């Protein structure tokens, strides 16, 4: 593994710990705020240095597009995008593909397969994996074809990335409540946010607790 400078090690640890705690990497702005950098551009320079050393991979144009490629030998935390590894505790989770209108998300006809994942990847245990369709959450590091790890829940705090059912559609968005209004926020300026109208059929199917990159599936 490449040798990191003390500052690079600190930033790598922040990325790793943020992923472990939230399931998603920090933004450049969050890294800059944590270390007192004058702007997110300074954080970007450190990230590029880490990428050159081969310990992370950057997704262009995505504010959370940071992927760990390796973990330090003194850490027991695996890469959050790793395939299942021998000798570690495995979870068997249903992989949900397309969801038909009006039917439960875990209905048998929606399950593409059962998939094994490393249990230590997630701070919170997920109940299922959902294959992401589209790029509306690109800037959160969630890309088309990725597998989103989801914990079933009917309530979620503001700012959480959720799986929501709106009428006959199921979507992945960031939840925002303002007073009595609900808005589903896209993490891509090319997509409009969804405002839940009063009386509109709406429910939460779960909260995102992690992500598995789609490469290799």
Swiss-Prot record:
Site (Cleavage) location in chain: 101-102
Record Pfam families: LexA_DNA_bind, Peptidase_S24
Gene Ontology biological-process entries: DNA repair; DNA replication; negative regulation of DNA-templated transcription; proteolysis; SOS response
EC category: hydrolase
Its EC number(s): 3.4.21.88
A Gene Ontology molecular function term of the record: DNA binding
Classification via PANTHER family: LEXA REPRESSOR, LEXA REPRESSOR-RELATED
HAMAP family, alphabetized: LexA (MF_00015)
UniProt subunit comment: Homodimer.
Recorded family membership: Belongs to the peptidase S24 family.
Protein name: LexA repressor
Lineage: Bacteria, Pseudomonadati, Pseudomonadota, Betaproteobacteria, Burkholderiales
């Amino acid at each position: 593994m490449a040798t990191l400078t003390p500052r690079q090690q600190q930033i790598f640890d922040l990325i790793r710990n943020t992923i472990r705690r939230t399931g998603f990497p920090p933004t450049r702005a969050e890294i800059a705020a944590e270390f007192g950098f004058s702007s997110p551009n300074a954080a970007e320079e450190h990230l590029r240095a880490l990428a050159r050393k081969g310990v992370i991979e950057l997704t262009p144009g995505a504010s959370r597009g940071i992927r760990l490629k390796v973990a330090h030998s003194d850490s027991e935390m695996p890469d959050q995008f790793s395939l299942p590894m021998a000798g570690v505790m495995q979870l068997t989770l249903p992989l949900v593909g397309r969801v038909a209108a009006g039917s439960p998300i875990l209905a048998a006809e929606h399950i593409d397969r059962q998939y094994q994942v490393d249990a230590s990847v997630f701070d919170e245990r997920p109940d299922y994996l959902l294959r992401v369709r589209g790029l509306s959450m690109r800037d959160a590091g969630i890309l088309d074809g990725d597998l989103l790890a989801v914990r079933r829940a009917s309530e979620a705090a503001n700012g959480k990335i959720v799986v929501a059912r709106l009428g006959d559609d199921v979507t992945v968005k960031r939840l925002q409540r303002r007073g009595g209004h609900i808005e589903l926020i896209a993490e891509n300026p090319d997509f409009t946010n969804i405002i839940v109208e009063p009386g509109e059929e709406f429910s939460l199917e779960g909260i995102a607790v992690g992500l598995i990159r789609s490469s290799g599936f």
